[in-house]
Amino acid sequence: MDREVRFNVLLEVLMAWHLFRLGRWSFVHRRLVAGAWAILFVVLGAGAATLAGQTNDNFELSGIESTEAFDLIQERSPQAAPDGASARVVFEAPEGQSLSDPDNKKVVDRAIADLTTDGVLSVADPFTAGTISEDGRVGYASVSYSSTVVDLPQSDKDALEDAAQAAEDAGLTVAVGGDALAGETALPIAELIGIAVAFVVLALTFGSLVAAGMPLLTAVVGVGIGVVSITLLTGFVELSSVTPALGTMLGLAVGIDYALFIMSRYQHEVRQGRTLEEAAGRAVGTAGSAVVFAGLTVIIALAGLSVTGIGFLTQMGLGGAFTVAISVLIALTLLPALLGFAGRRVTTGRLSFLKDRDPEGGSERTNGRRWVETTSRFRWPALVAGIALAAIASIPVASMQLALPDDASKPAGSDARVAYDLIADNFGAGANGPLIVVVDTQGADEPAAAVDAATTRLQEMAAQDGSDIAAVVPALTSDAPEAQEAFAQQLEALQLATITVVPGSGPSDQSTKELVADIRDAMADLPGETGARALVSGQTAVGVDIANELTDAFPVYLVVVVGMAVFLLIAVFRSIWVPVKAALGFLLSVGVSLGATVAVFQWGWLSSLLGLDTTSPVIFILPILLTGILFGLAMDYEVFLVTRMREAYVHGTPARQAVIDGFAHSARVVVAAAVIMMGVFAGFALTDDVILKTIGFALAVGVLADAFLVRMMIVPAFMAIVGDRIWWMPRWLERFVPNLDIEGERLASRLEADGATTA
């Protein structure tokens, strides 16, 4: 026997055999296993409670022009704290009054004084800064802090809230925007919705409340350990608030699903007459193998986000991957331990209104068997119809626009949204997201002339017909000699000047993005003419730059992640065409998901069902993040569904009949898993946080499309068309690819040879 063949046989035996031993050991030593997980949770929880820091929603990326502009300000004028927290306090006088009325002005002046705390760098008084509306009713004060959002002391937040409340009590309408009061993302409702849906589906699947509770319990423990670990990490690393939320979302979804597959196999083994101990071992050795490789595909897809080199995406990916890894370990160890505690109650005490049937019973005339028989019989129409439906649903993707989330997408009536709307209505939409043009005069022979040249170009752009520039605020706004002298001294010291450009459109509008490009084009030859350079920054510019970086990183990410996952699936299924078909089907799922997201969030179709009252571009991180997460989840369903088909095929069943038998065995459990995952994601789609809402909705639709349209319609139709060729693999490749025995065939043979007992 060749060395490669001997290695493959050894690996396939060790994989399933060790998982079998792990499951049986956890069942027998259940108190030790449960105690170890409980201690780990308590220790991590205590650490998180004492050492945790705060999260933030600032998407930052080094190496892009907009970030370089902020870094330049920070380097030469650190007291300006460009990365510090900020707030906009908007005041509105009652109908028929103005803010300049004596009583109202006193209220505003008092609020400005109250806002000036030790941690505040500056407060721009609306009366002196010119931020009073034409009718005099609305004005806003811009507050800049020396601390970042993460480090902002609670005392500064309290002072901001108290000042706003005092002005409100005095008769003004007051709203606070900006990031200074950005709070933590609240998730309890989202989690409860997912858990409620999961419990109902599990109860219907297993017919037992005890059995239904076990996957929920293990998933909650896995999520708890994953999230407290991430929370503990915030004490040492600055993380986005989406990172723990994403960990919660994925941990609940995959944690319940992985436990569901092992529980289903456990009940099946018990019905075959196994002892409870051996049934637990066999369930982990067989279904557990599928869970391991399904989990690996998700982990690869999420951890692979680090190849983009984009910090916040790397954080989200690694945080999600860690939680998924914990969920896999929990399913392989804590679940069999809990099965040991529950004993026969898992398979008895059924709900009276449900039939007593095997969750994996494939011989019955179930709806799943009827469906796959129909799909296989009419395979060409099913394949064409499935692909056509996915293609039609993907049409909106062609008009997808990406942008950073802003306060315009906050819930109606929230403080941040009220402040945004008041500013947009009274000062123009662009006032909510001005562009900052930073002029670096370090290489200029005449710095003042260079700044003037940059200002002149911007003013000429503003004067053109159809210009999207509402206003240009020069670095020097006064003609007074003393002001000019002070500016010259400052320019000589800092070698830096800032020009503010107020767009005529909002921060997330396409015209504002085009304006960023136009300004950069207009400034392209400034270095050659003056020796100075101009860098464009601001919220829209940051979004444009990050979107460009994501676009460049996306192909690399796809090649690395899809390549690794396809190789893993080749080893799992001993086939070239199954992984290729799985990857192509995944592209259809992504298209449907992104198409639906554009239709709802950008076009406004059925948006009221999600609590949206306005349309907005899709959040810029969604395409690559959705691709990573959904790819992993899609491969999950591919593994769980096609594993049973291959199991039937390797046992001698003809290829087309193997598709039917394998589908009938696994369809009920896969449907339950998909519905649970959709319920979890849909719960997050109902939150107020627009980032989580968008991700939750996109994932819910993606799972719906992948599980029901792709895996249960297109896949069986395609496999029925291809027949035996679907399992083809070149002989030379077989020598190098390990046979992982995910079906547990060699495990069963070894157990029978060892004389394993049955009840």
Each PLM stretch: what is its role?
Residues 63-85, 95-177, 399-607, 617, ...:
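Structured non-transmembrane domains adjacent to transmembrane bundles in polytopic membrane proteins
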Residues 91-93:
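A short glycine/threonine-centered beta-strand motif
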